[in-house]
């Protein structure tokens, strides 16, 4: 057989990169600027036995390549790359180590931790400067040539506009492991997420875009395995083109199973966004294993210390950092992104530690090579691009600094909203966050949707834990409860953790509604953490990255137990869809429209009057209203159907506040749509109030009113503007 393979070898082409089957054979292409020889290793179907090593015959523009006739999908392979082993010069070539193809689309076998995986001899004098001659192939996963054919039928991307986007962040495994409608054999898999009952539920929430935690092939950290834990979240990538085998039923159908899931989501009108980790790899620092990039071309792929190239720049906190200033690294990342869009049909990406991607030799640059590559790319520039705009390096915090076309996680929104609802942030701090954080994003023609607003995410407390714990409880992570954020801006409402106190539980439930309502009534793009809609808990663990168990898995029994909260979320998303003024494509203007004498946004105090300067500087200003008047539309072309007028009242005081309803005419009437103190306010119920009437706003609650155009008999016509009503605002339950 080896003689047959060698006889079918042709010179091939340098592009496309990776293993590309053209129907007659497979072209193998691998970039390495400093290698002296590259061997293609072919294995049996299970990846257990090496059949032959074939030296790639050609080297063009720093790319090694060759073509094998009659080798196609299902062929199992890896690489051995020869070159200098000079760690102090940044080179770590070791042909004894079988390497993963950076462009591999599928894998067979699993990584089994062994000292042979390391390019140096562990424990030997000289540490990583030594050279290890053991063969790592028995312990390595192997690459598989993939068949890209797939019948998408009529499935197409829903192309949800940014202004209608509501993101729902979840984890493939955690979301399905305990779902009663998912067959046991599908749990934890892409196919489980594609079960009709799962998709129907997600769709019913009113969200538009499902953001999946990393699905690229990743490695479980050895230190975690030694503790009986795993790298559950998956932020430890080793293959940027391959779906992780853990999430597929048949490892030889990984690409197809992922595509089937995407097709089912698209058929339901839901987008699929991937959380991607292009900032580092699973190979760690100089003491990490040699699995792929480190052995292919360490000097080119990684950022090394300028004066000590033995060591890695660690702006990620994981041991290494990909060099996104190198053209071939940029090419690999953009090739990967295009693959997931064009071949796998995903609709966007959230970039973990996104600042890394824009780092040039002198630091962050919003005109970096990678960002410019995305901006000009006809494929990537049309999908959703979301940055986590920080990293661990110097000058790493860059919220608001990404270029036009990008959205960004807005941690200032998260922190300020959390502070407000525990009484620690006044109106002056909350107001900018409510109208799209214009102070951060209103530049370069960016739109309010550039602000990804969130209260909770995978990293940190769940919503239920945010209102139930003052302190992290990460003992299960086996790091002496020292990992995870120490300052969470959380408030347990009086008791730490679960309680039987009815008053505490009622306050917690109201606080959760306050957070959800604030999120879905704010300008910008809202993101919900899966399970928050029914009060999922992680038992106070705010860093469950290593918990592949009940701590992280969604408990679906809570969906029935807390059905009222689920219904509240559905009501809020429906209101956001109904009122375009809540999701404007332009930043709201506080300037008066001279033609009609109205402002798009007016901030009002509890007296129903516009807030005065001294109130803006009052650190105790915890009750105020945001009046959104769609009739003004002070900027841009006037949009039909955008002329609703809404009043949102926020009260973070402990006590009830009488709030006088404002109006621009004696006939102004307000319909109560939401009172977070009344979780079961009937959807069809109409409680209507006149301008000047006072509504008793319960302590720590939020109200939403809409301006009524028609007369309703429920209005107390004896009221005068500014006079308080003796009628109860609504039935308290």
Positions of the model-derived regions?
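Conserved alpha/beta catalytic core and glycan-binding cleft of carbohydrate-active enzymes
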Residues: 345, 360, 366-530, 535, ...
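Substrate-binding/active-site clefts of carbohydrate-active enzymes
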Residues: 136, 159, 171-346, 353-379, ...
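Short, polar loop/linker segments at the starts of domains and inter-domain junctions
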Residues: 53, 179-196, 469-474, 682-691
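Beta-sheet entry/capping signal
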Residues: 27-29, 165-166, 208-211, 269-271, ...
